[in-house]
Every structure is written in C-alpha cells, then in structure tokens.
C-alpha cells in the first residue's frame, strides 16, 4: 500500500497469517554460477526490518522469516545491469498438495496491475486513438461518468485516472468468490447488484490533489474496451504482455484452465485458505493481473531501457518518460509511484488482492530492480527482502532504517494509555499481556509493541511511529500515526 493511502490501511496489507510453515527452495528453480549463487545466499541471509532496535539482532534468514510470518510461498526476481540476474521460488504453492514454488508459479499482482494498465492506455495515446487530457466521456460508449456539482464543472481526464488525481471514490476491490455472479463494468461503476462495492463517484473536483482510486482505474479499463472494441484481457495480451515477453502472465478473469497448474493458492490473515483458492477480479486493470516476478522483471527492464531510448517494444522513449513523470502529485505518475534514494530515482508499486501481496521497484538509471510476491495477506516480509537485495547489491541509501532504543515504562504510566482508539471505521486497542504490550486492530490482529520514549511506541511489523498526545489536563486523548511525512490521528473512545 502506497504511503499516500490512509495509513490505517497498512494493517490489512501486513497482518500476520497463521498456519503451516513453508519448505525450502522449490524444484525447477534455475541454478546459477558461483558468483550469483553467493549473492543469492547473501540476500537470503540479510533480511532487515524497517527499524533497527539498539542492542538487538537486526538481520534474519529468509527461511526463518517465512516460518516466523507463516508465509507459504514467496518468489523473487532480482534485476542487475538491465538483466534478470536471478529468480527463485521458495515454499509451497498450496499447503495441501505441497507443490513447490518455482519461478513459473503465478500470483495475483493486485494493484501492480495498474502499472501495466497504464502502459496499455498510453499505447493507445501513442497510436493517436485517444488523448490523455480530454474528458473521459469522449471515449466512453457503454457507460458515461455522471458528473455532479462536486466536480465543480471540471472534467476528468485519462491522465487524472492514471495518476489518481480525478477526485474519485472507491479505493480498492475485494473481488468475487468463484461461482458468484460477476458484475459487468457498468454495474461495478454504478455500484449496482451484483457488484459488491459502492459506486465510483466524485468526492472532490478533478486535478486538485491525489486520492488513490481503483475505481478510477476501472473507468480506464472500460475506456480501453470502448475504444478498441476488444475484451480488455485480449487487448492487453496483444499490445503489452506479449510484446514484453510476459508469456506466463494474463489479465483473463478467471484464469484459463491452462494456467491452473501454475496458480498459487491464496491464504487469509487467519491462515485459512481463501474460498475457491482465489478471488475473481472483473476489475482487471486495477487488480486482475496474474503474473510472477520473472515476467514483471521483463516489464521493469523494458521500462528502464525505453527510458534510455534503447528499446520500444510497447512505448517510445518520450511516452515512457511521460509515464514516469509525477502528475499533480509529487510522486504519483501514470500507474507508478516515484521515489528517490541516494540520488537515484525508482519507479514502483505495491499490490494486494485477497490472499496475495507483492511489491516491485526499478531504478531509472542504474539498471537495478527487484520483484517480491507472496500468497498470503501478510506483507511484512516484502520490505525485508527488498532491503536485503538493496543492501547486497549496493543501492545507495535505499535502506536507511529508523534506529530506536527500547525504554521501560511503569505500569502506572501504561494504564493511562490502555484502552480503545478509533480511526476511520477501525478500532485500535492498547493492552498488556504478561510483560508485553500489544496494539490490537479490530480485535483480530495483534502486534507486539515497544516503547521508544514515554509517549512514543513502535512495532517492528508496521512501518509506522505511534505517539500519544495528551490534553491540557494531562489525559491521553489521541494516538498519532506517522509514516514518513504522512500523519493520521486515532481518537480515544469515550469512557476509556
């Protein structure tokens, strides 16, 4: 989940899964030369958390962390010098069959789907079949966006949709169980039965600021279909996936029978298998891509080479530069988010579908990158693997952990903090069990916390610093959540 999204959402991308632990490296994984195998071992043994605690162990082994986080299947691809240096699968695709993960194993990519979608939409712009800065209703045929007074007379453009600056509702999608009646795109956009989400509507005028909207991405999917007169998955295969060599990947929902033997099974936070093994996402552009790290690495490499004018399998250098240029927001570009570390820019995206989470990063200039995917709702390990790759391959200042020292607090002081807090529909409880302190989310997920001062605490599992705020009488009233420059506030519930 990108930091621009509400911070409380992060809990549901990194909650701990429970159940069986994973086995080691899957069969049919390629072997490499000694130098590369040595690098792989270094990556496997150098996982690091977002925060370093003074006087404690700060690096871990991949297998240990998979067991600790109860991760069943994990797959990695590492890019170096504009090439896939290595790719490897770990664990099992399904806890019943115990089938090992390979580099071919397919995962749902969640919102990473948006990156390839933007590529497909920009291909239409490049071919002069649409204009990025024209009212979307110019291209919509099977449905029209219902403008109202909220948009203040301003028109939404495709550029707004791709950069999450359209001022639209509907952050994401839960998908549908296999066997459910699947809604059409117009039904989804209008929130009509059998759609399981609210209508996609204006919440503020377009072009004003960033607000993440999978609903807006779904409008872009319908535009692709209405302009090309092709099913979305067919257009994306012929114009994006196939040209990139992403031969294992597909936007087809549900996946074809030919792909079934490659599909990893999805698992929920409580360790239970997602009913039907995975959800179906008719919102293909926003969440419907099935892929693996090796295929996504091909997309990253093509983006890097196109940016340098060395390849144009899908987009020209000019169009690739446009795709990677933030639009209105300081970091949200077209289907990607841009960040900078040590003077190097990176493009990337996170993904989360039911029972799957993933992340990728690609550098602008150095030819480095990484993709990590797991078949669990637990995303805590993604950052740790990425940090390890960045450290082993010398990505300057990419991994700069927060350093904290644990302090002890009295029971009397803790009692002033204990209780329930409320934020955007979610309840957060501060409690103690034995000698340990916990943050409990909606009475379901429990995170061990440590105090770094008398008013500040953290969890190694959540990249957020929490701070208690008191009123004039010295009574605790709020908890501030801070992630980077983003802040949210959870208010203490009355009678606590």
Name each model-derived stretch.
Residues 46, 65-77, 96-160, 202-215, ...:
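Short active-site loop at a secondary-structure junction
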Residues 93-103, 381-387:
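A short, polar/charged loop-to-alpha-helix boundary motif
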Residues 60, 118-119, 134, 218, ...:
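A generic alpha-helix surface/boundary motif
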Residues 77-80, 136, 140, 251-259:
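Short, solvent-exposed turn/loop segments enriched in Gly/Ser/Thr/Pro and often Arg
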Residues 1-31:
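Bacterial Sec-dependent N-terminal signal peptides
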Residues 90, 94, 148-355, 359:
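Short, surface-exposed loop or secondary-structure junction motifs
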Residues 22-88, 225-238, 277-496:
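Catalytic loop of the DD-peptidase/beta-lactamase superfamily, centered on the K-T-G motif
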Residues 43, 47, 92, 135-144, ...:
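Short linear capping/connector segments at secondary-structure termini
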